[in-house]
């Protein structure tokens, strides 16, 4: 399924709204990942031996903002480019680091759930099934691009 004009508009409009609060939403996004899958904490070197709350961890804050922005911005470009657009070196790096950390399909699903919950909370009563479907499609395409790089890296 391609990314439709309507899906692009839904993602773009909600992203424009969410951009006003990226630091807070990014922390919420990562907090949800850790809430859904507490063992994910061990996948991040800056969280492994820490009992700090996510909002008190500057490395997590920086990482959360980077991941959240990249996820959302790649979704915005999906319709225009017809594919996930992340710099080639960035995509290769993402594939490599995800392979190194032994990220598997269930991990991608946790991140997807956290993303959808974050967008739902941020957009409030604007959240509808079609917005959920739009963000799901956008995320699935990003996850597929990362997985393809993981497979390429593993085969090399």
UniProtKB/Swiss-Prot annotation:
Globin domain ranges (all copies): 2-151
Origin superkingdom: Eukaryota
Cofactor: heme b
Compartments, as annotated in UniProt: Cytoplasm; Nucleus
Residues holding heme b: 45, 59, 63, 98
Chain ranges for the short sequence motif Homodimerization as given in the UniProt record: 35-39, 105-117
Primary location group: cytoplasm
UniProt cross-references to PROSITE patterns, sorted A to Z: GLOBIN, PLANT_GLOBIN
Cofactor mode of binding and number, as noted: Binds 1 heme group per subunit.
Keyword Nucleus (UniProt): yes
Site (Homodimerization): 132
Enzyme Commission identifier(s): 1.7.2.-
UniProt-recorded Gene Ontology molecular function terms: heme binding; metal ion binding; oxidoreductase activity; oxygen binding
Key word rRNA processing present: no
Record field: catalytic activity: Fe(III)-heme b-[protein] + nitric oxide + H2O = Fe(II)-heme b-[protein] + nitrite + 2 H(+)
Keywords recorded for this protein, A-Z: Cytoplasm, Heme, Iron, Metal-binding, Nucleus, Oxidoreductase
Top enzyme class: oxidoreductase
Transmembrane region(s): none
Subunit composition and interactions: Homodimer.
Role this protein plays: Phytoglobin that reduces nitrite to nitric oxide (NO) under anoxic conditions (e.g. during flooding or in waterlogged soil). May not function as an oxygen storage or transport protein. Has an unusually high affinity for O(2) through an hexacoordinate heme iron because of a very low dissociation constant.
UniProt cross-references to PANTHER family, sorted A to Z: LEGHEMOGLOBIN-RELATED (PTHR22924), NON-SYMBIOTIC HEMOGLOBIN 2 (PTHR22924:SF92)
Protein name: Anaerobic nitrite reductase HB2
Organism per entry: Solanum lycopersicum
Gene field: HB2
């Amino acid at each position: 399924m391609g990314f439709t004009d309507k899906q692009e508009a839904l993602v773009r409009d909600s992203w424009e709204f969410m951009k006003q609060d990226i630091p807070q939403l990014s922390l919420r996004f990562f907090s949800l990942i850790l809430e859904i899958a507490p063992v994910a904490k061990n996948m991040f070197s800056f969280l492994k031996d820490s009992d700090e709350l996510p909002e008190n961890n500057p490395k997590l804050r920086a990482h959360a903002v980077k991941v959240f922005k990249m996820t959302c911005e790649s979704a915005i470009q999906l319709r225009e480019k017809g594919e996930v657009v992340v710099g080639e070196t960035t995509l290769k790096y993402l594939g490599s680091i995800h392979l190194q950390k032994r990220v598997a399909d269930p991990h991608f699903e946790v991140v997807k759930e956290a993303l959808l919950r974050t967008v739902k909370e941020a957009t409030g009563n604007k959240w509808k099934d079609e917005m959920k479907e739009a963000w799901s499609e956008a995320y699935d395409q990003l996850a597929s691009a990362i997985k393809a790089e993981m497979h390429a890296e593993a085969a090399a």
